[in-house]
Design a protein with these regions (language model features):
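Catalytic and substrate-binding regions of cell-wall glycan-acting enzymes that process beta-1,4-linked
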Residues: 134-199
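Periplasmic-binding protein-like
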Residues: 1-5, 27-32, 175-182
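Alpha-helical scaffolds flanking conserved acidic
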Residues: 60-66, 85, 133-141
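Extended ligand-binding regions for polar small-molecule ligands
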Residues: 1-28, 41-44
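Secretory-pathway/luminal and periplasmic proteins that interact with or process carbohydrate-rich
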Residues: 29-33, 73-79, 122-125, 145-160
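Export/targeting segments at the very N-terminus of extracytoplasmic proteins
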Residues: 26-73, 112, 126-130
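Generic alpha-helical structural context detector
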Residues: 65-69, 88-92, 141, 152
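Substrate-binding/active-site groove segments that recognize
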Residues: 77-103, 110-121
Length: 199
């Protein structure tokens, strides 16, 4: 009851409206501009980095480039609403844990190198997904939204009779449902609310 009273007293305040927009309405993506020239085989000024580090993890370099485009629009100075920085939008804590010195998150090579390392580690967390193309979908979702939310969606998929090792029409459906209270409060979920529409 106390929460309801607080809500009723604050629902029209500027701070409440700003929080609602930040967490529930605004897109968290950085607006996209143009890329260089796909027909000429040039996606960005960082193609050499994508090629180098994608090879180390066994990915097509264009997939790594598309992840960077989605995350930062190839802007090395980008900083997200949540504090993620640089070309690959590394969270500072993740960057530190992966060996990036403080202040170097926006260095393109550091960013791509650490992102590739993180993607490789994340892929190991989904090793039970045997099809490598299917596993990549889970890895990309975890990169964007966090492994915990993907694990929650997998648990929900299993609970509701879907295949927890298949993304399309299975786990992807439950990543979206994690924005609904009955799902994010389900006992199989450990990581709470997740909007999911950008994952």
């Amino acid at each position: 009851e106390v929460v309801n009273q607080w809500h009723d007293a604050n629902v029209t305040s500027p701070a409440y409206r700003a929080s609602t927009k930040r967490y529930f309405e605004n897109s968290k993506r950085i607006p996209h501009g143009s890329i260089l020239s796909v027909k000429d085989g040039k996606i960005s000024h960082f193609d050499h980095l994508f090629k180098k580090y994608a090879e180390e993890i066994g990915w097509d370099w264009r997939l790594l480039a598309s992840l960077a485009f989605t995350e930062s629009n190839f802007d090395t100075t980008a900083v997200s609403w949540a504090g993620a920085k640089g070309l690959m939008q590394l969270m500072p804590r993740t960057a530190r844990a992966m060996g990036v010195p403080e202040g170097k998150e926006q260095n393109p090579e550091e960013s791509v190198k650490v992102a590739a390392k993180y993607l490789k580690l994340t892929s190991r967390s989904f090793s039970k997904i045997e099809d490598p193309n299917e596993r990549i979908k889970f890895v990309l979702a975890a990169y964007n939204g966090g492994m915990g939310h993907v694990f929650d969606a997998m648990a929900l998929a299993e609970k509701y009779g879907k295949n927890k090792y298949v993304w399309d029409n299975n786990v992807a459906d439950f990543i979206l449902l994690k924005s609904k209270e009955e799902y994010f409060n389900d006992p199989v979920c450990r990581n709470g609310y997740f909007r999911g529409i950008e994952t």
